[in-house]
Amino acid sequence: MDQNLEMNKKKFFSKILLFGEYGIIKNSKALVIPYKKYYGSLKFSSKLDNVQKDSNINLKQLSKYIKNNEFVSNKINTLKLDSDIENGLYFESTIPESYGLGSSGAVVAAIYESYKQEVGIDLEINDLKLILSNIESFFHGQSSGIDPLSCYVQKPLL
């Protein structure tokens, strides 16, 4: 019997954003609150079902994007990420997609947490937000970084 293994025990929660992403991109303020009803985490399976395969393929595309992004390519261990993807890595999530609840932010936070190059180094919050926004831009074209930052620090942000 195939066993799905969690990569780590950390869950990355969805979020509730008051005042909207577009406003943040245009330098307005917003309040972001972690919403623990929905969450996601990285897992492995040696026999991926269709949903897990889709996630695995999406992670492959994200890894390729990271490697081609000059700003973040040296901040993520893509060799390890690619190896894990080939070994059945996927993102399991209860976060509804396309509703603005932070499904892409949770994926980005999980990837950064698990594959960041600079382990043990505390970055300034704005530096971390910039890294996460660059990675999340894979999903949306332009990201403020507030969604993955909220998922990563798991605290309300203003």
Model region roles, listed by residue range:
Residues 2-100, 113, 117-121, 154-156:
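ATP-binding N-lobe of GHMP and related small-molecule kinases
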Residues 92-102, 134-142:
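A short glycine/serine-rich beta->alpha loop
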Residues 103, 124:
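Conserved acidic
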Residues 106-113:
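Short amphipathic alpha-helical face segments that pack within enzyme cores
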Residues 125-158:
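Alpha/beta catalytic cores of group-transfer enzymes, especially the acyltransferase/condensing modules
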